[in-house]
């Protein structure tokens, strides 16, 4: 009773604590120290999520408690966090926090948004798979994933997106991201020579089976110009907007790519995010709620597009935008190709509003040329 009160648990968390009392006590003994106080918060939220009821998770947590860390993993954790707590305790703290706060994973000051997104997605949607990744990276110094049936070893991949080993990360990311980054880059290299954007093939293989195999992009890869914008928008509405998809909620989180802009609506770069859900906010405005791994979700993207993190129906860790504004910054999304694919009958007014936000921001310099020629006149 005292423990559940100290953790501030609801009836859900208390029931989970009662069912897995021995495991929880072992996690506290191994991972909670004055230097790892955040583990308490992570543990409380893990119990509130009820994920220990998933059959593989509790055995995987016992494995984590007894995991023998490699010398490389111990050195990385000690270098980043010091010697006040053991590397094992630091990693347990990191696991508890990532499983308790899956939308709190950050990429730090590193170009590793794809890897951060994958860790968040696994913690959110497939926690035992995340624990398997942690085991491989921390114990074996190697992760092997498959791309179109062929194995890719993180040890055999040449290099990743990040030029240097990132250090400003949580304990799990510190150990796992270097491996994921190299594998992600290798998957991209295996797409060289294919026509189109490599994310079409990489994202479903890298993130998980639930990532839609259907793929839509509104930028011509060869020229960088906008292409088929109307179809792109109508298909996105048909796939994600409750008013156009039969009021079907999003079942699994989906990877997507956005064109990030600054407060003057100028293009900064491409960025990986996760679409979590679409729903009406308290003011009856349809919004997209998403996860942004860049540690700064509440950003001003210019032209009145201001990302919200609270006050508009966001759950903890979510960012959100009105559906139209989000669509205007979107350049890649996935969908299930087996779903009915009729384009949404979006009104011309709404379509023009989305295109207006697009053309006034990152699309301003990407408008396709019209190739108009002057009439030579009569001869």
Predicted stretch roles:
Residues 62, 72, 122, 136, ...:
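A residue-identity detector for tryptophan
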Residues 23, 39-40, 58-64, 185, ...:
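Generic low-polarity alpha-helical segments
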Residues 75-186:
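Glycine- and small hydrophobic-enriched segments that form the cores of compact globular domains
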């Amino acid at each position: 009773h005292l423990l559940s009160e100290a953790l501030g648990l609801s009836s859900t968390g208390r029931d989970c604590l009662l069912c897995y009392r021995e495991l929880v006590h072992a996690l506290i003994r191994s991972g909670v120290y004055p230097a790892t106080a955040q583990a308490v918060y992570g543990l409380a939220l893990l119990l509130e999520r009820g994920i220990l009821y998933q059959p593989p998770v509790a055995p995987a947590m016992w494995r984590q408690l007894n995991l023998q860390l490699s010398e490389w993993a111990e050195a990385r954790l000690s270098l980043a966090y010091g010697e006040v707590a053991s590397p094992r305790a630091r990693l347990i703290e990191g696991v508890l926090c990532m499983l308790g706060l899956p939308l709190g994973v950050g990429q730090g000051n590193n170009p590793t948004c794809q890897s951060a997104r994958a860790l968040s997605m696994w913690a959110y949607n497939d926690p035992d798979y995340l624990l398997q990744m942690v085991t491989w990276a921390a114990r074996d110094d190697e992760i092997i994933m498959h791309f179109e049936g062929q194995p890719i070893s993180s040890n055999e991949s040449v290099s990743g997106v990040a030029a240097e080993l990132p250090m400003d990360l949580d304990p799990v990311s510190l150990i796992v991201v270097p491996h994921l980054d190299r594998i992600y880059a290798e998957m991209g290299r295996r797409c060289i020579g294919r026509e189109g954007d490599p994310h079409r093939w990489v994202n479903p293989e890298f993130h998980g089976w639930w990532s839609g195999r259907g793929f839509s992009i509104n930028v011509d890869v060869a020229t960088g110009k906008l292409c088929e914008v109307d179809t792109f928008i109508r298909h996105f509405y048909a796939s994600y907007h409750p008013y156009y998809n039969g009021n079907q909620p999003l079942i699994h989180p989906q990877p997507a790519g956005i064109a990030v802009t600054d407060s003057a609506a100028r293009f900064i770069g491409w960025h990986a995010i996760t679409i979590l859900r679409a729903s009406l906010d308290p003011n009856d405005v349809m919004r997209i709620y998403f996860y942004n791994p860049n540690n700064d979700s509440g950003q001003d993207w210019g032209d009145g597009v201001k990302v919200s993190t609270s006050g508009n129906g966001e759950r903890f860790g979510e960012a959100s935008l009105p559906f139209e504004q989000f669509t205007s910054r979107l350049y890649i999304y996935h969908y299930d190709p087996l779903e009915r694919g009729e384009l949404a009958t979006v009104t011309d007014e709404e379509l023009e509003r989305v295109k207006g936000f697009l053309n006034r921001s990152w699309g301003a310099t990407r408008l396709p040329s019209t190739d108009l020629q002057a009439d030579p006149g009569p001869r």
